[in-house]
Amino acid sequence: MKNVVVVGSQWGDEGKGKIVDWLSDQADVVIRFQGGHNAGHTLVIDGTTYKLRLLPSGIVRKNKISIIGNGVVVDPWALLEEIEEIKSKGVEVNVDNFIISESANLILPFHREMDEIREDAAGKGKIGTTRRGIGPAYEDKVGRRSIRVMDLRSETNLDHRLETVLLHHNAIRKGLGKKIFEKDKLKEELLKIAPEILKFSQPVWLRIDEFKKQKKRILFEGAQGILLDVDHGTYPFVTSSNTVASAAATGTGCGPNSIHYVLGITKAYTTRVGEGPFPTELTDDIGELLGSRGKEFGTVTSRKRRCGWFDGVLVRQTIKISGIDGIALTKLDVLDELDEIKMCVEYELDGKKMDYLPAAVEDQLKIKPIYKTFPGWKSSTQGIKNIENLPENAKNYIYALEDFIGTKVSSISTSPEREDTILLENPFEV
């Protein structure tokens, strides 16, 4: 029995959906452990497209148990809407195949509004959030004033918790000249949907312990990417949760010894959505080509992604931070038309060479990438399923990438289709 954690090794949008879908087919249990509905997966199964934001990818598979862990912040209205959306496509979501941690924190309307207010006020200094209330909800969690799923069970307790959290938020809203939130109205709205949320609520840590004893395969599904981690990412241009593999333990209530393999999803080039440092960003025709061929638009926001060359220095760093055992290299086929391909192998900062990304954002913004150039292969890799059938220059690029980052490539994706994958190592069977 092996348990696998999937994380993004860059800034998110690495193509986790396809890989997670393939792994979830082999897993018994699939668990989301951090983030909210600010990041999404697009799955295509038997010609049907599913866009998931909160629900784990296992939900579209029969005989799988899908779980939202305590580390996730949940917008209850968005969750119910997503459930109805996939139900309309024939997917079953019931108390037998879906569980929400009773300790998960809720995103409420004033969180969304606060997110928007801050982003609008920040001007050029904005973070580039999805304006869905994720950050403010995590702030309330850390501030010990949050409302959790379990609080929906008691009207008296909910009233008290709302009073506490609104004391904080309404004080800020008054200072900003905004209308205050009415406690009774919000309580009424929450009590109205409470039964639909509570029927899925369980102590997730206890269920995971049972699954481990039953030798079930567990897939921990990360959202976003390591470079957006609140501690280890390009702070302050990060998300509000820990996106590294170790967050799977804290975000679900299982010990770190429950993790046996960490798979880092890694794009063959680099993208970033929103603001923040991006050493290898391309603003020329090549950047546009990568964006066009890679269809680089966000699943949740439809925002255009910034594109650039593969940054080996960054990926090598995230591999060390997250304890990645192997990478799934995605979107190799996007590079098919290029005459030459570059890989960042070092940085220069104020005339000095560096082999890692410094922590200070001021330094990150000044960094100059140093590249190694590889000849392109100028032929299609799309649909190839055996590494020996790849063009020689494509293989050379992969081997050089693997050697530089110091971690094996466990699979290579050669198109958005699930079947178009070169499998070199199955994380569940290592």
From Swiss-Prot:
Signal sequence, renumbered to the chain: none
Name of the protein this chain belongs to: Adenylosuccinate synthetase
UniProt-annotated binding residues for Mg(2+): 13, 40
Annotated residues for binding of IMP: 13-16, 38-41, 130, 144, 224, 239, 303
Pathway: Purine metabolism; AMP biosynthesis via de novo pathway; AMP from IMP: step 1/2
SMART domains (alphabetical): Adenylsucc_synt (SM00788)
Localization annotation: Cytoplasm
Its biological purpose: Plays an important role in the de novo pathway of purine nucleotide biosynthesis. Catalyzes the first committed step in the biosynthesis of AMP from IMP.
Lineage: Bacteria, Pseudomonadati, Pseudomonadota, Alphaproteobacteria, Candidatus Pelagibacterales
Catalytic residues as annotated in Swiss-Prot or TrEMBL: 13 (proton acceptor), 41 (proton donor)
Keywords, sorted A to Z: Cytoplasm, GTP-binding, Ligase, Magnesium, Metal-binding, Nucleotide-binding, Purine biosynthesis
GO terms assigned for molecular function: adenylosuccinate synthase activity; GTP binding; magnesium ion binding
Binding-site positions, substrate: 299-305
Family according to the record: Belongs to the adenylosuccinate synthetase family.
Cofactor note: Binds 1 Mg(2+) ion per subunit.
GO-annotated biological processes: 'de novo' AMP biosynthetic process; IMP metabolic process
Subunit composition and interactions: Homodimer.
The enzyme's E.C. designation: 6.3.4.4
Cofactor annotation: Mg(2+)
Binding site for GTP: 12-18, 40-42, 305, 331-333, 413-415
